[in-house]
Each structure stands twice: as C-alpha cells, then as structure tokens.
Amino acid sequence: ETGIGMTPMQRWTDLEEGNTCMSCHGRAGVDYTTFVGGADCKTAFDPDVGTVSSCATCHRIAGTPDQWSRAEHGKLAGRVCIDCHMPLVERPVAVGTAPRLVRSHTFPASSNEAQLRRAYAYDAQVTGNEVVVRITNKGVGHNFPTANRQRGVESLVVVRDRDGKEIARSRLVCRYPYASELAPHQMTLPRGSQIPSGKTTEHRVPLTIADGTVECRLYFKLYRPSADTDADLARCLEERRIPF
C-alpha cells in the first residue's frame, strides 16, 4: 500500500486475509477495480517485485537485509532472497495453463525442515577434558537464525557419569535478545548471538569426571522460550551420544 522500500502501513481492514498476492505484487496508483487480466498484467503490477529491496520492505524490521548485504553466502556470493526462498519450479501459472519454469510461491524458510537442514553443519566431540560442539552457518545468506526475535538455535550438552547420573548441563542459545532480556536501563545496543553467514559458533563444556557419557542436542525454536519437547514450536535437529 505504501510502495516497495517504504514502511508498510498498519492495516485495519481485511485482517483475516493475511499476506495476499497484492502484498507483494500491488502497484501504487493502479485501480484494480477495472482489472480484467490479459494485457493489463503487463502494467498493473510492480516490476520490482522479487528484488531485495522489495523483500526488505517488511523483512528489514529484523535486520535480515542488512545481514544479507555482508553475508558470505548472500550478497558476497551474488545470491538474492528469491534464489533460496522462491526457487525455480515447473508449474502452471494459472488454472488451465501448461506448466512452465517459474518461481515457487511456497516460500520455504525456518518452518520447512529440508530448508532448515541446508542452513547449518553440526559437529560434536570430546576433545581432551571438554566437550566441543561446533555449529556452522554453511548455506544461509543471512544470520542463522534470523527474522523474528522469537527464533532461536539452541545447543544442549548434558554430561552423565558411568551410572547415568546427570553431572552437568549447559545450554548455548543463538538469538537476538528480547527487550526483556536486556540489562535494566541498558543504553547500549543489544548484541545478538546469531551465527553470521559462513561463520562457526562453538559451545564448550568442561568435563569434571574421568569417564561417562555426553549427550548433545541441537534444537531450532520457532518461538522462544519454548520447551524442547514442544511438538509445534521446537524441533530437535541433531542428537549425539558420546562415551568418554
């Protein structure tokens, strides 16, 4: 309604529609009450749809376009948003038309497990007297995770003795903090722990016993804080059991 690159207006009508075709394709100044398709399609829709600036209209609120501008697998690799989130597929553009190669409109992202698993590499091992977990942002053109502050990547390490008794538990959370997580009267900018594109975060946990077992898990949280066992909001991506 405000145009590509402009801050969206708060909408008071048709809230039940959510995002529609017009959210991205609408062009300022066009009277769609007279739209009949056909030749109108050439002029009725914004030609900049699908550009990074188009996506940034809404997604810049979470800093994702800024992250992309410095990302090893993003702008620096010549990739744009639609390369990952609107891949080319063969499908009919409209009912009754023959399939052809066009952009997918399913927008795979953090709710899509296959897309999520392409984003990272995970390694867990016992090195000397500590557990070392490495999480690498191997394929994302922005931070991992990004978008809403609710998103989180969590590494959990549990150390047990030879009898299975829990000795230690450590959790590393990669996220951008909520305002409620800042220090009282904090006047400095918050510092996130999201993993930048192409970078690795380490989670190190010391071992204080001679032998036992380490349990390592990697969770993705669609909304944090949520329980690791929440079937809707949490997904266990990796699980390792390492004797030492």
Question: Residue spans of the language-model regions?
Answer:
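Primarily the internal scaffold of c-type cytochrome electron-transfer domains
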Residues: 2-184, 188-200, 205-209, 223-244
